[in-house]
């Protein structure tokens, strides 16, 4: 009962409002606030009132402007970068090594036979019959050529360039199975380009090159991709360089190692690659001390005599240092080690720690990235390189209907080839140079919040020396179980030394440049400096704002009621009926005080012996006041609410 009574009092007080007008509320605020300035507006003379009003308004605007700047700076989510240097025993990085040639030519020659003959013929047409040593009488398999031919573009007239197929006998486009001598255009007068057409031939583009060397290399790689995409992965692995042939000697610190300590992985660009200290099945190996003697020492045989002649023009080893359990993107982030040289690589470690949302768009494990990570089949950690390549493969499958050979495939998808997807090269070329595709992938992919970078200092020396090369190559040859009359040579041997320069590591860490404490301190400092205010002054200002809103709502409600009453009165003409008239109409239907005749109308009741006796009318009150049983107490009793 007491709760109900209290709630009724509270409701009544809400309906009444603060009980002030706008002017009274402003005067009360200026007289009671602790902020400097408003009190002087109501206490001084007219001139000083105007002066203090202008000053108060000016400094209030200045404070609001400063607050806006600080809040905008805070919402920019800026970071500050701190650099710290630590010293501890560190895990040795994972080391991936590959041969520059992905396959042994002796094992893939049967797959590339037609392509190699066609390549020799192409070189003959480019060089001209006087410089070519190719037998031009051989018949060529031009089925590969027709998908993506190379052409001469004669630009002597820039407004009307002439396009000629390398194997056309005339300008009409007829072709023969063997190259015709005496071409009217040669490499020094014409540019070599690659013609890429859609399957129906309605759309063709030309990919130009500044050198014929680049043109034929890109063309051969594209055709080889078509061939290798149709070969099962197990056969491709068998065609690459085995670990026991590639790795001749291994030493980590004071402990010997061999090819069994390396994890094999197939890379489409470099064939069989091998990773030392990947950490997939065992704990990462630590380095006992900095220096060459405590690092990894390798002697590698590149087998340059078995390189694919037109596919690989670089001789040496490709290597990369990376974190444990991370996929090696060795084509983009690796370095070459030259054959016939001893390459020493000193390593320094940088650890990057980025702030997450909302300070940056980094991700901890890639779970919030909307791109399917195609490299997750390797059980590796997330990286932005994996995301970008997965995104490209996703676009490739959506636009071209097949996946590119260089990237992993999603489930139940096929690699592109000329037989099943005749226009894949045209589609791939357009997608490769598409700016929209690159921007989409860069926008969708995120950097990793925690990353480790290995800074390398590289030095090289000739190895072995002339005085020692004879016995070193003979010993290494015998250890490879080769006959004594077949020795290794300087052209195929690489020696590597990989070690920590020092155990000092740098940690580059991002932290919030402006936190909530910084924001509150600056807001309070500006408010206190310009207006002498505090948090309590803000609460006072909030209170008066609430009262203003409260009074406004009450006035709007009262105005709505007044408008509604005026509309209701406009429906009736004349003055409203009195209470006595309303009671007469509802209690005695036979009584008509003003309109009825003085006596009963006998004609109105022809069948009645006696007309009905009129009822006694009620008192003719002009008003009727009803007092409810439960009298609500006066407002003065509820002022304590």
Curated annotation (Swiss-Prot):
UniProtKB keywords: Cell membrane, Cytoplasmic vesicle, Disulfide bond, Glycoprotein, Ion channel, Ion transport, Membrane, Phosphoprotein, Sodium, Sodium channel, Sodium transport, Transmembrane, Transmembrane helix, Transport, Ubl conjugation
Pfam families this protein is in? ASC
Topology within the bilayer:
Multi-pass membrane protein
* Motif PY motif: positions: 617-621
Which one GO biological process term can you cite for this protein? sodium ion transmembrane transport
- Ranges where the record places region Disordered: 597-624
| Protein localization | Apical cell membrane; Cytoplasmic vesicle membrane
List, alphabetically, the GO terms of the cellular component aspect: apical plasma membrane; cytoplasmic vesicle membrane; plasma membrane; sodium channel complex
* PTM-bearing positions, type Phosphoserine: 634, 636
InterPro entries xrefs: ENaC, ENaC_chordates, ENaC_CS
Molecular function terms, GO-annotated: ligand-gated sodium channel activity
Query: Which ranges sit in the Cytoplasmic compartment?
Result: 1-50, 555-641
What is this protein called in UniProt?
A: Epithelial sodium channel subunit beta
Catalytic activity entry: Na(+)(in) = Na(+)(out)
Q: Where are the transmembrane segments?
A: 51-71, 534-554
Which branch of life, at top level? Eukaryota
What does this protein do, in the record's words? This is one of the three pore-forming subunits of the heterotrimeric epithelial sodium channel (ENaC), a critical regulator of sodium balance and fluid homeostasis. ENaC operates in epithelial tissues, where it mediates the electrodiffusion of sodium ions from extracellular fluid through the apical membrane of cells, with water following osmotically. It plays a key role in maintaining sodium homeostasis through electrogenic sodium reabsorption in the kidneys. Additionally, ENaC is essential for airway surface liquid homeostasis, which is crucial for proper mucus clearance.
Tell me which PROSITE patterns the record gives: ASC
């Amino acid at each position: 009962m007491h709760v109900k009574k209290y709630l009724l009092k509270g409701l009544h007080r809400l309906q009444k409002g603060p009980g002030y007008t706008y002017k009274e509320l402003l005067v009360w605020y200026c007289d009671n606030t602790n902020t400097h300035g408003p009190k002087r507006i109501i206490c001084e003379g007219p001139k000083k009132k105007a002066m203090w009003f202008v000053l108060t308004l000016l400094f209030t605007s200045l404070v609001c402007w400063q607050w806006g700047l600080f809040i905008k700076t805070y919402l920019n989510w800026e970071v500050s970068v701190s650099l710290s240097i630590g010293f501890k025993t560190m895990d040795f990085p994972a080391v991936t090594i590959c041969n520059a040639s992905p396959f042994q030519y002796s094992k893939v020659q049967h797959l590339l036979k037609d392509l190699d003959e066609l390549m020799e013929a192409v070189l003959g047409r480019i060089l001209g019959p006087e410089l070519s040593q190719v037998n031009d009488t051989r018949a060529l398999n031009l089925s590969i050529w027709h998908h993506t031919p190379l052409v001469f573009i004669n630009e002597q007239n820039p407004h009307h360039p002439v396009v000629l197929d390398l194997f056309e006998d005339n300008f009409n486009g007829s072709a023969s199975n063997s190259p015709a001598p005496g071409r009217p255009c040669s490499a020094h007068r014409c540019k070599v380009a690659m013609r890429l057409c859609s399957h129906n031939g309605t759309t063709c583009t030309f990919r130009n090159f500044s050198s014929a060397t680049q043109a034929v290399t890109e063309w051969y790689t594209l055709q080889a991709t078509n061939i290798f995409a149709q070969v099962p992965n197990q056969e491709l692995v068998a065609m690459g360089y085995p670990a026991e042939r590639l790795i001749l000697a291994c030493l980590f610190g004071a402990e010997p190692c061999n090819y069994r300590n390396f994890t094999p992985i197939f890379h489409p660009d470099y064939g069989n690659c091998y990773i030392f200290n990947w950490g997939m099945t065992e704990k990462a190996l630590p380095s006992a001390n900095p220096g060459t003697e405590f690092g990894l020492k390798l002697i590698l045989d590149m087998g340059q005599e078995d390189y694919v002649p037109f596919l690989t023009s670089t001789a040496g080893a490709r290597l990369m240092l990376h974190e444990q359990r991370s996929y090696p993107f060795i084509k983009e982030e690796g370095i070459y080690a030259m054959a016939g040289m001893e390459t020493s690589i000193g390593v320094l470690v940088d650890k990057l720690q980025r702030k997450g949302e909302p300070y940056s768009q980094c991700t901890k494990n890639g779970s919030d990235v909307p791109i399917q990570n195609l490299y997750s089949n390797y059980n590796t950690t997330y990286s932005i390189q994996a995301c970008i390549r997965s995104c490209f493969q996703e676009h490739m499958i959506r636009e071209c209907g097949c996946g590119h050979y260089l990237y992993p495939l999603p489930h139940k998808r096929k690699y592109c080839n000329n037989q099943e997807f005749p226009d894949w090269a045209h589609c791939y070329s357009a997608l490769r140079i598409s700016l929209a595709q690159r921007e989409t992938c860069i926008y969708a992919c995120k950097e990793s919040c925690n990353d480790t970078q290995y800074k390398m200092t590289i030095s090289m020396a000739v190895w072995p020396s002339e005085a020692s090369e004879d016995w070193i190559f003979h010993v290494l040859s015998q250890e490879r179980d080769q006959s004594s009359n077949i020795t290794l040579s300087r052209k195929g041997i690489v020696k590597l030394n990989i070690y920590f320069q020092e155990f000092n590591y740098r940690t580059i860490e991002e932290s919030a440049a402006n936190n909530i404490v910084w924001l509150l301190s600056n807001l309070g400092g500006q408010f206190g400096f310009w207006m002498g205010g505090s948090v309590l002054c803000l609460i006072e200002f909030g209170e008066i704002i609430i009262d203003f809103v409260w009074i406004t709502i009450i006035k709007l409600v009262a105005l709505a009621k007044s408008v509604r009453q005026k509309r209701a009165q406009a429906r009736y003409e004349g003055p409203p009926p009195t209470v006595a008239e309303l009671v007469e109409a509802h209690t005695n239907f036979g009584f008509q005080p003003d309109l009825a005749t003085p006596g009963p109308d006998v004609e109105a009741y022809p069948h009645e012996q006696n007309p009905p006796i009129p009822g006694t009318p009620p008192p003719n009150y002009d008003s009727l006041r009803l007092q409810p049983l439960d009298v609500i107490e006066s407002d003065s009793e509820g002022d304590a609410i």
